[in-house]
Every structure is written in C-alpha cells, then in structure tokens.
C-alpha cells in the first residue's frame, strides 16, 4: 500500500476526445491483464525458492518500500518511452516476489489454495463492480483524491506501528480499511481514465495494479485469519 503514494502524479488530460479516452482504457485493461503474469511468476518463484521468508518484519518492509519507490520512479520517468512497459512488468514481478511470504503462509493451511482463489475472485469482483460504477456515475469524483490520499497515509502510519506492535487485531483493522480505501481508489482511477483525466496507459495501469494488489493481499490476510484451517 505504501507505494501508492508515488502514483499520485498530476495529469491534466481533461478535454481529450472520446476516441482517445477509449483507447487509453483499452490499453490499460490489456496491460493490466498482462501485468498479472509476472506477478504470478514472482510469487511462484518466491515460494519455490523460499526467498519469501526474508521479506518479513521491519527489514522486509524496508526492502519493499525502497524497491517499490525505485520502480515507481523509474516507471514515471519512462512512461512515454519504449522502456515503460518492461519496467512496469519488472515491478509486477517484484510485487509478486514480495507477496510470496503471504502466499507461502496461506498455503500452510489445509485450505490455503482455496483461500487464495477466494481472495482472487473477491478482488476480481470488486474490480468489476468499481468498473461498472465508473461507467454510470456522471458526477466528477476528482475531489475524492485528496481524501483517499490521506487514508493511504493513515494506513502507512498504522502499518509501520503494527510492525513493532505485532497486533493481530491491528492487522485486521488495517486490512479492512485497506480494502475499503483501495476499492474506492479503483473507482476513482477508472473514472479519471473515462473522463480523460489520465491519458497515459502505463500510469493508469500502475495505479489500478496497485489498487488490485492491495485489495488482494488485504483480503487474503483476512481470509487467513478467519478461514484458515490446519490439519
């Protein structure tokens, strides 16, 4: 969730033609689908090699934060060049690698695979609902941005505190709040594309990807707490 901060880049694309807006939306959905492949590969590699165990605790958080900020900076710098897509896909592999610790822990449950598929299906459902809402809502949602940003800051601070406290209740509260905030961000970001506020499909993909990955990992964490079964 912390890397979401780096994606809030001002973009004055309003007033573009409907044809261009539709093109950006199509390209965004195409690249978003493609980005899931490196994510799965990264998660698989992390679980298969066991490197995911090194991405826990404070040190794991530091590695995650440094890597995410570095990748996001590189993506924003190259989003208008041929290097933008490969760097974005590299970032999604990195995110899959960082997810591998949670995936590995979930697979430790007897119903772990089922929990992962449930989290995936739930995330897909949230995305479909938000995409549908974005197409029917006529009002300008740009005012949501600053409030959602504040929400992300609060989540970040809460996550850092909980790293040291190690509270399960705190983790659950943060996860539930993250699902709500990043679901709203999906609506906000898709609406921006539809309205012409985002004209670069790489930036748009990055924003939506971060929303999706945060909803997924938060939902999976909650499912592990409430639905994890051990033999």
Give short role names for the model-derived ranges.
Residues 1-231:
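A hydrophobic alpha-helical transmembrane-helix feature that marks the membrane cores
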């Amino acid at each position: 969730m912390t890397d979401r901060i780096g994606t809030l880049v001002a973009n004055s694309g309003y007033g573009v033609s409907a044809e261009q807006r539709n093109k950006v939306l199509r390209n965004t959905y195409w690249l978003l689908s493609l980005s899931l492949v490196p994510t799965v590969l990264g998660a698989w590699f992390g679980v298969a090699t066991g490197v995911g165990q090194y991405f826990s605790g404070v040190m794991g958080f530091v590695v995650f934060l440094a890597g995410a900020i570095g990748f996001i900076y590189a993506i924003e710098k190259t989003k208008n060049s041929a290097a933008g897509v490969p760097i974005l896909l590299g970032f999604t592999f990195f995110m899959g690698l960082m997810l591998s610790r949670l995936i590995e822990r979930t697979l430790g449950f007897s119903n772990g695979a089922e929990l992962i598929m449930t989290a995936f299906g739930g995330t897909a459902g949230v995305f479909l609902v938000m995409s549908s809402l974005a197409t029917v809502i006529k009002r300008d949602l740009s005012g949501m941005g600053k409030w959602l940003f504040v929400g992300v800051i609060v989540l970040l601070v809460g996550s850092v505190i909980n790293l040291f406290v190690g509270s399960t209740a705190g983790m659950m509260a943060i996860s539930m709040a993250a699902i709500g905030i990043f679901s709203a961000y999906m609506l906000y970001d898709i609406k921006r594309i539809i309205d012409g506020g985002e004209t670069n499909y790489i930036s748009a993909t990055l924003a939506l990807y971060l929303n999706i990955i945060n909803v997924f990992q938060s939902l999976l964490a909650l499912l592990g707490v409430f639905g994890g079964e051990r033999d």
